[in-house]
Amino acid sequence: AKYNLPVYITQGTLNGCRFNIREDLIRLLYSTQNISVGSLEITSFLKIHDASEPHSFVVSNGGTKVGVFTDIGAACEQLIFHFKQCHAAFLETNYDDDLLSKSAYPYFLKQRISGGRGHLSNKHALDLFINHRPSFMTHLLLSHLSKDNNNPELAHSLFSEHAGEVEIVVASRFVESEVYTIFEQVSEHSPF
């Protein structure tokens, strides 16, 4: 409420919310709903995660699309559909399988993280990237890396081997990412 900004939230997430949001700031969000904020259009869609009515988002401006895909248990059809349309994406690479298995985390937490409704591993995120990245993708920001169960250099190296022309960036948990110029590439067959 400090900035009096509207909060776009699903009913399920609102019901499970642990803090108070002023009623006049609440904007209920529904699956596959498009919301306009200035010149941006935001599309939301349901995803697999162990939360109440979780959604991911694609932010568009003109023909350029940026996906925000974090807190994902598995790459469902909805996620794949939207990922294939993105010029850039923030993609969860939460954990490395070996680091998680050797970590001090209790068994139940390891199962929650890796059990298909928790978080996306480096391997699963890489599979999504290799098999479904569009030819026009320019940037991939590896996001939501666990400080205990992943390593930024490891994740970057893994993706860089398969990146081609895509710039791979590890999003820091401590500082903002740089500003990138991302644009819709026009094919040589386009009349424009």
Locate each region found by the language model:
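Short, surface-exposed connector motifs at secondary-structure boundaries
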Residues: A1-Y3, G62-G63, S135-L141
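Active-site HxH/HxHxD metal-binding segment of metal-dependent hydrolases
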Residues: A1-Q33
